[in-house]
């Protein structure tokens, strides 16, 4: 089966290598992008190259579906508590309190991760930025909203689901972590 992988170019080699190793029967067809706004252009007219598409997350899939009608199955790798636990450990090792600003609007995933880590509500604080419209200024607006929460002291660090936001905040020296799917998340989705 030909599996079209639609993810940021920076993750492509690692993700494709993992899938090819774990699922040798799958023929991986890469569809890398740099910016979420490029996804429709990257996919336009190319659905016939794959039997299904696998997106890094729901946001990327949603963005593509605004301009392209799926003619093959489109799946997304779900975000999981295990991916968040990895980031909590990294943040704690760096000395950050678990006061988090995020653009991932899935509170149940955060709550599940907090419970799995044995953390109480008194030990954590979660601040969701408002959902923003997908415009040409989306990435900048998202980064600024997260940055504002850290600079105000409301949050100690950020967790983002967008690669461009991650890089923008790193350039601004704002503590930020990129929420990526774990190998287990990928495995569960492909199998």
List each model region and its residues.
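Alpha-helical/coil-rich non-catalytic "connector" segments in signaling and regulatory proteins
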Residues: 1-191
């Amino acid at each position: 089966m030909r599996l079209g992988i639609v993810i940021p170019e920076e993750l492509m080699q690692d993700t494709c290598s993992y899938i090819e190793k774990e699922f040798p029967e799958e023929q991986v067809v890469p569809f890398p992008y740099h910016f979420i706004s490029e996804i429709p252009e990257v996919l336009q007219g190319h659905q016939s190259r794959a039997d299904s598409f696998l997106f890094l997350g729901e946001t990327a899939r949603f963005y593509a579906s605004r301009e392209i009608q799926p003619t093959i199955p489109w799946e997304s790798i779900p975000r999981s508590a295990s991916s968040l636990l990895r980031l909590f450990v990294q943040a704690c090792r760096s000395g950050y309190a678990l006061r988090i600003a995020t653009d991932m609007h899935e509170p149940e995933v955060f709550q599940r991760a907090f419970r799995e880590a044995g953390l109480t509500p008194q030990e954590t604080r979660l601040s969701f930025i408002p959902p923003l419209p997908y415009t040409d200024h989306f990435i900048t607006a998202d980064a600024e909203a997260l940055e504002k929460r850290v600079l105000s002291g409301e949050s100690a660090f950020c967790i983002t689901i967008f690669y461009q936001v991650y890089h923008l905040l790193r350039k601004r020296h704002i503590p930020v972590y990129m929420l990526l799917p774990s190998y287990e998340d990928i495995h569960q989705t492909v199998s």
